[in-house]
């Protein structure tokens, strides 16, 4: 297959972080609005906002986000950013995307939780109207933050009723803040009866993924540890959990030291629910087209595999039932 074939394939993305996926041109635009100086050379700028090909750890990978935080402190900036990420996705034939972000990281200059969600949803709607993509927002609680602050943020977010804000996630430092450490926050979100996904299995800790499965969470970000844990993989499959796999990101952070440590083939053989994602388009210097190329290169994934994974993604998405029906029909037509 050639690159153009991968580009043309209709795609679904469930795991994409807003602040890790801004295009360089949008980063420059936002810096201008915030009156923040940036390196004039794109290659130099890229070094600040793209993580090394191999990082020492997940925490080193997360350092790239510090550069973006000051740029996302106004309604206008968040709207521009959300539009940019959804546009990037649409231009590579992504027909549905969930973009996740942490309101806390955009509240340094006085924005409220509600204002951040409204601004992101506005940007996503602009992209939907312009490009025909369906784009939704997820709100992340930061697991390493003060829990009383996170609890307030989650409660305020839950008051927002916007059809483009569809669920919750917990992101950040998994290693030091596993599910048990933030269990009250997880239970708080579960009490809302709104969809939730959860980062687990990215830092080499099988217990964290096991805990998230035991808590009844049906979508999991990364699940990388499954490559080494056959019994946990059985539980993952038995409980119908869907994995949001992020190959390039996992290789960067050493969640998977080599391609052989990535769980895709074992998950596929076990009949697990698999989706393919970028995680962070800019921080990982990737997009879904590149990810599909890598799956084909390393795992011999076929067009039929991509069709199956995209169907899984639609079924596991937080879209409405009507939107899922529409997306499944669009996907079937695109792959026929």
UniProtKB/Swiss-Prot annotation:
One of its GO terms (cellular component) is cytosol. GO terms for molecular function: 2'-deoxyadenosine deaminase activity; adenosine deaminase activity; zinc ion binding. Binds 1 zinc ion per subunit. The record marks 222 as: Important for catalytic activity. Its EC number is 3.5.4.4. It catalyses: adenosine + H2O + H(+) = inosine + NH4(+); 2'-deoxyadenosine + H2O + H(+) = 2'-deoxyinosine + NH4(+). It comes from the Bacteria. Zn(2+) binds at residues 15, 17, 199, 279. Keywords: Hydrolase, Metal-binding, Nucleotide metabolism, Zinc. Pfam families: A_deaminase (PF00962). The active site is at residue 202. Belongs to the metallo-dependent hydrolases superfamily. Adenosine and AMP deaminases family. Adenosine deaminase subfamily. HAMAP family: A_deaminase. Catalyzes the hydrolytic deamination of adenosine and 2-deoxyadenosine. This is Adenosine deaminase. It comes from Streptococcus thermophilus (strain ATCC BAA-250 / LMG 18311). The lineage of its organism: Bacteria, Bacillati, Bacillota, Bacilli, Lactobacillales. The gene is add.
């Amino acid at each position: 297959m050639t690159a153009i074939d991968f580009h043309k394939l209709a795609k679904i993305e469930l795991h994409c972080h807003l602040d890790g996926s801004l295009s360089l041109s949008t980063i420059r635009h936002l810096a201008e609005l915030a009156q923040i100086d940036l390196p004039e050379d794109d290659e130099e700028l890229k070094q600040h906002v793209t993580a090394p090909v191999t990082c020492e750890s997940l925490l080193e990978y997360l350092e790239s986000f510090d550069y973006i935080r000051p740029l996302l402190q106004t309604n206008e900036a968040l709207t521009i950013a959300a539009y940019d990420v959804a546009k990037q996705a649409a231009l590579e034939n992504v027909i549905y995307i969930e973009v996740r972000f942490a309101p806390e990281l955009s509240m340094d200059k006085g924005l409220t939780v509600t204002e951040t969600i409204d601004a992101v949803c506005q940007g996503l709607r602009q992209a939907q109207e312009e490009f025909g993509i369906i784009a939704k927002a997820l709100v992340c609680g930061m697991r390493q933050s003060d829990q009383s602050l996170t609890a307030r943020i989650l409660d305020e977010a839950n008051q927002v009723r916007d059809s483009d804000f569809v669920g919750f996630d917990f992101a950040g430092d998994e290693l030091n803040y596993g599910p048990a450490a933030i269990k009250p926050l997880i239970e708080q979100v579960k009490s809302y009866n709104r969809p939730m996904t959860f980062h687990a299995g990215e830092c080499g800790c099988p217990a964290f993924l096991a805990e998230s499965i035991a808590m009844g969470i049906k979508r999991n970000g990364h699940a990388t540890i499954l490559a080494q844990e056959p019994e946990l993989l059985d539980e993952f499959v038995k409980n119908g959990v869907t994995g949001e796999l992020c190959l390039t990101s996992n290789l960067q952070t050493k969640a998977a030291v080599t391609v052989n440590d990535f769980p895709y083939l074992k998950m596929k053989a076990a009949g697990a629910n698999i989706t393919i994602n970028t995680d962070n388009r800019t921080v990982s210097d990737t997009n879904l087209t590149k990810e599909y190329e890598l799956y084909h290169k390393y795992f011999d994934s076929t067009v039929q595999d991509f069709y199956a994974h995209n169907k899984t993604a639609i079924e596991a998405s937080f879209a409405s039932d009507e939107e899922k029906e529409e997306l499944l029909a669009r996907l079937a037509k695109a792959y026929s």
